[in-house]
């Protein structure tokens, strides 16, 4: 499955917001520069995501965009369909030399593929696409050396 550039930017921006970890709004300019995306184009995408209830915006000096729900509650399908519209089989099969029953079987098969893809994309949440948090090394307790010993 190939994602459009617009969907790719939408996913990238929502993941940046999810990775931010706070509910503080992030300016579009920061998302654009950190994600290496064109700011004006990204702004249009963010507005669409806001319209679909995926993001919320805050105006003002400290304004920007944030996720409207937790990353565990936003599916990849929601982001894709907010930008590209409903995932579909691609329309009717072109008229061909094939008998009508073959065309019907093909449409049924394509519909099943689309339904499976929709279910898979719905099951993938933004939280699952985030990189794991960095491991913080745990050091063993310090072992006293002769230098540390105090004579009594």
Question: Where would I find each of the regions flagged by the language model?
Answer:
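Alpha-helical residues within the helix-turn-helix
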Residues: 33, 50-51
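A short alpha-helical element within helix-turn-helix/winged-helix DNA-binding domains
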Residues: 26-35
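Conserved segment of winged-helix/HTH DNA-binding domains
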Residues: 71-95, 110, 114-115
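Key DNA-contact positions within bacterial/archaeal DNA-binding proteins
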Residues: 40
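Beta-hairpin "wing" of winged helix-turn-helix
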Residues: 53-67
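Short, hydrophobic-biased segments on the C-terminal half of alpha helices
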Residues: 14, 46-47
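C-terminal regulatory/oligomerization modules of transcriptional regulators
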Residues: 96-152
């Amino acid at each position: 499955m190939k994602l459009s550039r617009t969907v790719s930017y939408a996913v990238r921006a929502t993941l940046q917001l999810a990775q931010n970890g706070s509910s503080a709004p992030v300016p579009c300019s920061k998302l654009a520069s950190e994600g290496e995306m064109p700011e004006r184009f990204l702004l249009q995408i963010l507005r669409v995501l806001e319209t679909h209830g995926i993001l919320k915006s805050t105006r003002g000096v400290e304004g920007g965009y944030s996720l409207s729900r937790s990353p565990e509650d936003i599916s990849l399908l929601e982001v894709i369909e907010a930008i590209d519209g409903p995932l579909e089989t691609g329309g009717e099969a072109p008229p061909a030399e094939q008998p009508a029953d073959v065309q019907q079987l093909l449409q049924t098969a394509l519909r099943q593929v689309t339904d499976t893809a929709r279910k898979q994309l719905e099951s993938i949440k933004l939280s699952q696409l985030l990189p794991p948090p960095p491991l913080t090394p745990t050091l063993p307790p310090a072992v006293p050396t002769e230098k540390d010993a105090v004579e009594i």
